[in-house]
């Protein structure tokens, strides 16, 4: 045997643990799952509500010992992207010639972040396109609307099923935040579809409504949110609005976007929360109001249908129907017993459906479907995720 071979043999012997009679063989400790998250909507500061459900999901995954790196507008400059304020849709509409460069810079940024990742988690179908070019197993989440734009998940499934089939066909798992989105995804031929709602923070206590009774709306002031119908249906009523957007002139007394603490206070004060959307992938505002024990009046559309059980957790009205919207609001304002009953039912439903513990557990099951079986068993043995669906 050569000298080099002897040296190699010695080094190997020194690093191998000595077997001890009666002691079980030591197994290597599995490394935490590494996930690169790509999203075009993410909070840039504490009071920014853009994509907050994504940042909350990231926090919960990290609490489960998942290593997560996020690529989002807030960190684009770190990756040398050409993002320039106002949102991606705004950038592309104002300067369409930057679209190819912007797309390539996103791909490059995600490739860099995902270099050591086991999995990529892309949000929205547009994010799935970027994930396709990273050479990693990926999961894509469909959220629904993107300010009613041409990249809206519902619109893409309906208008371009072939494109959607191509994107989702390469995904190891498809997460949809509502059954309506799940049906839209399946209609294109998508497989491995998981319907997992957005997680919602559940307040410990419920605060009684304020006097005089307030009708509350919060969110983007844009056509797909039913702002025109909201303004018409609430004429002469005590409407409180938090939000901003292109239809701000229809609700000139809006408080604008407020801090999280102020938003919580507004939920607590509300007698009725209104969600008059024309299109809605999930309905974060609706779910948050329900978590606060507030009765909601919501459009019977999209993800809102999966949250509100008419007459049990709120009242549903046809989307765009101003007369029905007004009637439902007035019915609740005139019946405190009904408000209390619907509010209690709403809170119980959201606790069952949307607690972050449950949503994170189910997300990890979707990740489980996307990674190699050997890693699944090692991670499950280490207690990093459950082996079986409950």
Residue spans for each PLM region:
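Conserved donor-binding/catalytic core segment of Leloir-type glycosyltransferases
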Residues: 36, 207-225, 231-240
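Membrane-proximal helix-turn-helix segments that form the acceptor-binding/catalytic region
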Residues: 111, 157-173
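Short His-centered aromatic/hydrophobic patch
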Residues: 122-127
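Short alpha-helical donor nucleotide-sugar binding micro-motif in glycosyltransferases
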Residues: 168, 258, 265-270
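Carbohydrate-associated surface elements
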Residues: 180, 199
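Aromatic "clamp/platform" in nucleotide-sugar-dependent glycosyltransferases that forms part
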Residues: 278
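Short hydrophobic beta-strand element within catalytic cores of glycosyltransferases
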Residues: 295-298, 308
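Conserved acidic donor-binding segment of nucleotide-sugar-dependent glycosyltransferases
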Residues: 310-311, 315-322, 331-336
């Amino acid at each position: 045997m050569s000298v080099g071979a002897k040296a190699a043999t010695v080094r190997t012997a020194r690093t191998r643990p000595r077997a001890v009679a009666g002691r079980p063989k030591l197994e290597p400790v599995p490394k935490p799952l590494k996930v690169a998250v790509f999203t075009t909507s993410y909070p840039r500061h504490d009071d920014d509500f853009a994509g907050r459900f994504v940042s909350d999901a990231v926090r919960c995954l990290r609490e489960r010992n998942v290593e997560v790196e996020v690529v989002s507008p807030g960190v684009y400059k770190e990756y040398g992207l050409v993002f320039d304020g106002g949102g991606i849709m705004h950038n592309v509409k104002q300067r369409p010639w930057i679209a190819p460069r912007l797309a390539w810079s996103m791909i490059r940024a995600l490739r860099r972040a995902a270099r050591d990742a086991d999995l990529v988690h892309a949000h929205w179908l547009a994010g799935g396109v970027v994930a396709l070019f990273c050479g990693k197993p990926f999961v894509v989440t469909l959220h629904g609307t993107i300010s009613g734009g041409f990249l809206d998940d519902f619109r893409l499934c309906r208008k371009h099923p072939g494109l959607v089939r191509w994107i989702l066909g390469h995904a190891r798992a498809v997460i949809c935040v509502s059954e309506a989105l799940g049906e839209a995804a399946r209609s294109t031929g998508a497989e491995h579809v998981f319907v997992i709602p957005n997680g919602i923070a559940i307040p410990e206590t419920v605060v009684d409504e304020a006097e005089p009774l307030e009708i509350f709306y919060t969110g983007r002031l844009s056509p797909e949110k039913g702002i025109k119908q909201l303004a018409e249906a609430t004429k002469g009523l005590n409407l409180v609005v938090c939000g901003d957007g292109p239809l701000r002139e229809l609700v000139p007394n809006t408080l604008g976007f407020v801090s999280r603490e102020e938003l919580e206070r507004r939920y607590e004060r509300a007698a009725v929360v209104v969600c008059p959307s024309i299109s809605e992938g999930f309905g974060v505002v609706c779910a948050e109001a329900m978590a606060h024990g507030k009765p909601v009046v919501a459009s019977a559309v999209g993800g809102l249908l999966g949250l509100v059980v008419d007459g049990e957790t709120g009242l549903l009205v046809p989307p765009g129907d101003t007369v029905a919207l007004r009637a439902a609001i007035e019915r609740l304002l005139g019946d405190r017993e009904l408000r209390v009953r619907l509010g209690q039912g709403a809170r119980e439903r959201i606790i069952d459906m949307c607690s972050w513990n449950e949503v994170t557990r189910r997300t990890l099951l979707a990740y489980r479907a996307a990674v190699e079986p050997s890693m699944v068993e090692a991670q499950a043995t280490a207690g990093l995720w459950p082996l079986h669906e409950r």
